[in-house]
Each structure stands twice: as structure tokens, then as C-alpha cells.
């Protein structure tokens, strides 16, 4: 059985499929009521599964009649998406942010499950056993070298 976050994520992705659009607009209260969950559960899904690293932009308006607008970032080809990711990676990157990037590559079928697991192993904090600042810098450098390879090979 999937957890509530997985169910909400699949529902939002289905909205994209059914609409054939690059934008989906949802209301927190309606989704929370539909899935009998608190609005913060929806916020968690949006913040962790519909990030820039996953290829989405979020616009949110709170209050009565508020909405969450989720837009698929338009990158019609792998090169555009890879370039977008390269711009997101600064001089350092946390393990979680790096995992979001890998998940996005997997979602867009630019890598397979095996490759994703190998990349996870290489950039994991256990592998990069050093102080956090150095670890995050090295992780960013690894990804910056790896992404063009994924794009061109």
C-alpha cells in the first residue's frame, strides 16, 4: 500500500496527464478534503516531489480562494533539462537536493534505476566521509561533471 504522499503525488501527475497541459492549478483545501488529510501533507508533497530539480515550478497564493499552480518546466529535450539542472547546482549541494535531481533524471528516463542507485552510492554522505561543507562542494562537482555525460552518452 502506498503512503498518502505517494497517492497525492500520483493524483497530481494524473491531473497533468488528463489535462495535456504544462500547468495544473489545485486548491489546498479541496485536495486535503479529497484525501482526508491536513493541508500541510499537501505542502510536504509539493515541496519534496514537485521541485525545480524534478522539473516543476510552483506558484502559491494563500488565503480564501488560494491556489497552488504547478508548472512543468519546458525543456523539450534532454539538453534543455540538463542545462536547467546545471544552473540549479551552485558551488555546493546537499544530499537531499542531489537526490531530487537524480529522481528527476529517473522520472524523465534520462537514467535507469541501476544508474540512479550507482549515482546515489557515489554522492552519499557515507561515501563522502568528510566535513559537511567539503562534502557538499564535492557532491556538487561530481554532479556538474556527471550531468553532461548523461546528456551526451
UniProtKB/Swiss-Prot annotation:
Gene3D superfamilies: Transcriptional regulator CtsR, C-terminal domain, Transcriptional regulator CtsR, winged HTH domain. GO terms for biological process: regulation of DNA-templated transcription. Keywords: DNA-binding, Repressor, Stress response, Transcription, Transcription regulation. It holds the Pfam family CtsR. InterPro entries: CtsR, CtsR_C, CtsR_C_sf, CtsR_N, CtsR_N_sf. The keyword Membrane does not apply. Negative regulator of clpC, clpB and clpP transcription by binding directly and specifically to their promoter region. This is Transcriptional regulator CtsR. It comes from Staphylococcus aureus (strain bovine RF122 / ET3-1).
